[in-house]
A protein has these predicted regions:
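Internal catalytic-core helix/loop-beta-alpha segment
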Residues: 136-156, 161
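Glycine-rich catalytic cores of cysteine/serine-nucleophile enzymes that process amide/ester linkages
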Residues: 46-140
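N-terminal short leaders/motifs
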Residues: 1-12, 34-39, 63-80
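Second-shell loop/turn segments in exported
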Residues: 132-142, 179-186
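Activation targets extended, charge/polar-rich intrinsically disordered C-terminal tails
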Residues: 2-28, 36, 155-220
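Alpha-helical transmembrane signal-anchor/signal-peptide segments
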Residues: 28-51
Length: 220
């Protein structure tokens, strides 16, 4: 009986490592293959940024196409900061709300985000126009593609009574907030695949299938 349990355990371990290997292969090669184009100039400039694990898009707050403050009200944000650009990211709700710093990361939060479909949230921050750096890239976009990007981003917010649903008191600072989001987070639908899909919607060069930041930023 003990031998059977050991054999079963070994099969489970073997299956896990096979799955992990396939997952890494898919994410690696999916991130290497490019789709979309980069423009030398355009109607608007946006930014794509990463903290090494998570990615966001940074969009001009007010243009002829949209005034983001009519969708994401400035009310819950401190009026001491700048509202020139709006930074938006999608991700695991538990991870977002319970991990303001990496030092506070819990194993249970990480495992839930990785292996179980979980609730999601939008992270929003207003700021001045970002500066280009190794972890932040400027991208030009034309008006029609920007409209598609806007539709994608707006559709990611979960609405309540036809308005986005603020998660009160959970921002990391006075200049950022969290909102309820649509869709579930899991291994094949990560914060980076959201950014990747946003860029693909706007026909911006990125990886075909990017689960990690490198599969996005390496193309920009």
């Amino acid at each position: 009986m003990i031998i059977k349990y050991i054999q079963l355990l070994l099969k489970i371990i073997e299956s896990f490592f096979i799955f992990l290997f396939v997952y890494l292969i898919i994410s690696f090669y999916g991130g290497m293959i490019s789709t979309g184009d980069l423009q030398a100039d355009g109607d608007y400039c946006i930014y794509v940024q990463s903290n090494g694990i998570h990615t966001d898009v940074c969009l001009p707050t007010e243009t002829e196409v949209i005034d983001w403050s009519t969708f994401v009200s400035k009310g819950p944000f401190s009026d001491e900061g700048s509202f020139e650009y709006i930074t938006i990211g999608w991700g695991d709700k538990g991870f977002f709300l319970n991990t303001p710093t990496w030092a506070e990361l819990k194993m249970s939060t990480a495992l839930t985000a990785a292996f179980l479909p979980s609730e999601t949230a939008m992270h929003v921050q207003y700021s001045k126009e970002p500066e280009v750096s190794e972890s932040r890239v400027k991208v030009y976009i034309n008006e029609s593609d920007y409209k598609n990007l806007i539709l994608f981003v707006k559709s990611s917010f979960k609405l309540k009574n036809e308005k986005i649903d603020l998660i009160r008191g959970k921002g990391y600072s006075k200049s950022d907030n969290f909102y309820e989001a649509n869709n579930s987070y899991h291994l094949f639908q990560t914060c980076n695949s959201w950014t990747n899909n946003a860029l693909k919607t706007a026909k911006i060069k990125t990886g075909v299938f990017a689960l990690f930041p490198h599969g996005i930023l390496s193309h920009l």
